[in-house]
Amino acid sequence: MVLMIVSGRSGSGKSVALRALEDMGFYCVDNLPVVLLPDLARSLADRNISAAVSIDVRNMPESPEIFEQAMQNLPECFSPQLLFLDADRNTLIRRYSDTRRLHPLSSKNLSLESAIDEESDLLEPLRSRADLIVDTSEMSVHELAEMLRTRLLGKRERELTMVFESFGFKHGIPIDADYVFDVRFLPNPHWDPKLRPMTGLDKPVAAFLDRHTEVHNFIYQTRSYLELWLPMLETNNRSYLTVAIGCTGGKHRSVYIAEQLADYFRSRGKNVQSRHRTLEKRKS
């Protein structure tokens, strides 16, 4: 059975995550004090029910040792997993402005910006030991729920999911990436007027990049690196690996290479997802 602990900065989507987990059959509890985690787990053990518990800055223990002790006191039949949701600072500020809700630390007479920064510091002990960190900055409520269903179902089956994610450096580096590869040195289809409005998913762009030896070399060496270390990652109780591929705008080169890598590992029987941050942002 799984005990999914959901945490993250306020406004990052914890309530959405908890609802998605409830739809997946988890017994969900919002804002349970950490010291009560073992009691909850023991009460559910005989019923063979997986549980999900949200922890925010208001019920954080005074020291990390209290959290570690609670984890050690869980029944052996439970496998604890920590999901940490986050978003960039500007996104969190915008979400609070849109909803006009008070930040949990607003009672300390802090500005919203200061409250967000202090919350980040207080939650760092949980973030540093998270099994999965999800950046929700560019996600809608429905996209977050669907992504969590896909990834967390994989985790419950102890299956490593490889996520290949393209992005544009001018939009920022994804904070949920385990590996980041920069492909801005490769030939750029952007400078061909016919290819400029297309994306790395279009055949003419793929044909352009496929003609260059350095593109083939980069793909080969990147997949060889991942193949070398993948067995170690799989045996390290890890269920996901996020590989981010970045070019200047996130439209041509990074998209093509992310798809090539995804297709390669998919053809070898791996559980693979691909995501294109810039293209998804243009659709929304």
Curated annotation (Swiss-Prot):
InterPro entries, A to Z: P-loop_NTPase (IPR027417), RapZ-like (IPR005337), RapZ-like_N (IPR053930), RapZ_C (IPR053931)
Region (RNA-binding) location: 266-284
Pfam annotation, one family: PapZ_C
Binding site for ATP: 8-15
Alphabetical UniProt keywords: ATP-binding, GTP-binding, Nucleotide-binding, RNA-binding
Keyword Ribosomal protein: no
Cystine residue pairs: none
GO MF, one example: RNA binding
UniProt record similarity statement: Belongs to the RapZ-like family. RapZ subfamily.
Function: Modulates the synthesis of GlmS, by affecting the processing and stability of the regulatory small RNA GlmZ. When glucosamine-6-phosphate (GlcN6P) concentrations are high in the cell, RapZ binds GlmZ and targets it to cleavage by RNase E. Consequently, GlmZ is inactivated and unable to activate GlmS synthesis. Under low GlcN6P concentrations, RapZ is sequestered and inactivated by an other regulatory small RNA, GlmY, preventing GlmZ degradation and leading to synthesis of GlmS.
Name of this chain's protein: RNase adapter protein RapZ
The species this protein was found in: Klebsiella pneumoniae subsp. pneumoniae (strain ATCC 700721 / MGH 78578)
Lineage, highest ranks first: Bacteria, Pseudomonadati, Pseudomonadota, Gammaproteobacteria, Enterobacterales
GN (gene name): rapZ
